[in-house]
């Protein structure tokens, strides 16, 4: 099977690329060549997907069984992909987001039939618009699309809600005995999925004829509350977390991004029903528990000092919010 990834070297997609190559898939990566690619066996097509004429020339005369765009975020990019790829593939897979599901939810158990609506996050609304365009072109023109919605997925990032992502800040902060923020009272439920588990559900969808016209989320079945998540991160770093619980609304007052990140996503208890992906991919099961996966992630950061970057803005944000909250809290009569 001949497959083209637009992207393919990121936090989620690298694991998919590795699994695809291990299964003998003829994998091409379309990228700008700015990131070192450690994927033996993958072929590279150099180009910028935003330069449509350049890409049209690069794929002229080529046909791929599957094309996956890992880095499409707005409807205009979907329109471009429809123009570019309609005659070059039998399956186009769009990477959407599980953050598109209804917020606030009418039911905590989320399936692919859960309504799509997120008034808190423009990122999610753009992904919804992308899906709507793909569903329309599938219905009206038979464009062979499949939609996949990752949720909070990690490998080479630290998947906390506040304090880190592609940086080491939250770990450094814990190791130095500083306070960290957990939104709300830390008891809302959440699902975090390792990229290798995601890959085991994703790769079998490639070339799957019955997946055409369908949407899927692919997550772990492990539900943890946020206290457990931060405690697992601390345990993996061999420290204790000094948690300060702060209401999400209060946190969001300090940073517009947190409106979407918390109120439109991570502050909302969510339990994913993965029965659909298990029907289409018999035997799929996520096997990496978070306490084991996050230990691997921290070891990955600490293997190379250059990865252990500290973002001063993350420390400043946490210090600012904690100080303001503690002042308010202390002013309330006991």
Annotate the PLM regions.
Residues 120-148:
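Active-site Tyr-X1-5-Lys
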């Amino acid at each position: 099977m001949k497959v083209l990834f637009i992207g393919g070297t990121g936090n989620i997609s690298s694991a998919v690329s590795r699994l695809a190559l291990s299964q003998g898939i003829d994998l091409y990566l379309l990228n700008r060549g700015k990131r070192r690619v450690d994927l033996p066996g993958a072929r590279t097509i150099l180009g910028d997907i935003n330069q449509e004429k350049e890409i049209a020339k690069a794929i002229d005369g080529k046909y791929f069984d599957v094309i996956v765009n890992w880095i499409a975020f707005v409807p205009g990019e979907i329109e471009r992909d429809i123009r570019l790829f309609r005659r070059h593939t039998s399956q186009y897979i769009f990477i959407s987001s599980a953050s598109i599901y209804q917020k606030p939810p009418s039911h905590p158990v989320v399936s692919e039939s859960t309504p799509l609506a997120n008034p808190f996050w423009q990122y999610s609304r753009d992904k919804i618009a992308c899906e709507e365009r793909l569903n329309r072109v599938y219905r009206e023109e038979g464009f062979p699309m499949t939609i996949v919605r990752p949720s909070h997925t990690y490998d080479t990032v630290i998947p906390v809600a506040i304090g880190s992502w592609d940086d080491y800040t939250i770990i450094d902060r814990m190791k130095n005995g500083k306070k960290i923020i957990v939104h709300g009272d830390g008891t809302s439920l959440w699902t975090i999925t390792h990229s290798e588990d995601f890959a085991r559900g994703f790769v079998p969808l490639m070339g799957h004829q019955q997946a055409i016209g369908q949407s899927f989320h692919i997550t772990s079945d492990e539900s943890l509350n946020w206290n457990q998540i931060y405690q697992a991160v601390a345990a993996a770093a061999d420290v204790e977390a000094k948690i300060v619980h702060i209401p999400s609304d209060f946190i969001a007052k300090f940073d517009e991004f947190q409106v979407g990140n918390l109120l439109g996503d991570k502050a909302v208890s969510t339990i994913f029903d993965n029965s659909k992906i298990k029907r289409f991919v018999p035997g799929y099961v996520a096997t990496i528990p978070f306490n084991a996966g996050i230990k691997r992630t921290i070891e990955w950061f600490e293997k190379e000092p250059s990865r252990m970057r500290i973002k001063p803005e993350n420390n400043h944000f946490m210090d600012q919010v904690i100080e303001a909250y503690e002042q308010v809290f202390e002013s309330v009569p006991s």
